[in-house]
Amino acid sequence: MDLRLRRGTDRDAIAVSALYLRARKAAKATIPMTVHPDDEVRRWIAERIVPHTELWVAEDDGGALVGLLVLDEDWLEQLYVEPTLTGRGIGSELVGLAKRARPKGLRLWTFESNLGAQRFYERHGFRPTERTAGDNEEGAPDILYVWDAS
């Protein structure tokens, strides 16, 4: 599959929201469900993520949105791939883009229960540096991962 990576725009808000919600629901066995209703998530993406962060989207050959990446300063805030397309390199392409965009380093949180994400980020050179007992809105233990280019 050929991927096109590009900056997300306000025209992408609906598709980004749909992908985000599908991916979160598909991962419900490994991550806590969002504490916000779907409409609130859509509004958050349209009003906060799109205009105030660095949003990137991955599109397939047909123009369908198959992945998303959100960067905010040195934070990799969100990375989601179409659930039916995991394991095909889309997430790796997005992480590579994040590293190129932030060559001095990146930080991210992932849930302790999300072992797949932990393996994925560790394969990409991130290392765990801190663990919490659930000091987040989901109340779930999480892990801070850091990548630096050195």
Predicted regions: what is each one?
Residues 107-110, 127-144:
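Conserved catalytic-core motifs of GNAT/GCN5-like acyltransferases
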Residues 57, 63-80:
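Conserved beta-strand in the GNAT
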Residues 17-46:
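Conserved GNAT-fold acetyl-CoA-binding loop/helix
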Residues 121, 126:
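Conserved active-site tyrosine of GNAT-family acetyltransferases
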Residues 101-113:
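Conserved GNAT acetyl-CoA-binding A-motif
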Residues 46-57, 75:
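A short helix-loop-beta-strand connector motif used in the catalytic cores of GNAT acetyltransferases and
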Residues 85, 89-97:
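Conserved acetyl-CoA pyrophosphate-binding loop and the N-cap/start of the following alpha-helix
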Residues 4-18:
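A short beta-loop-alpha structural element at the N-terminal edge
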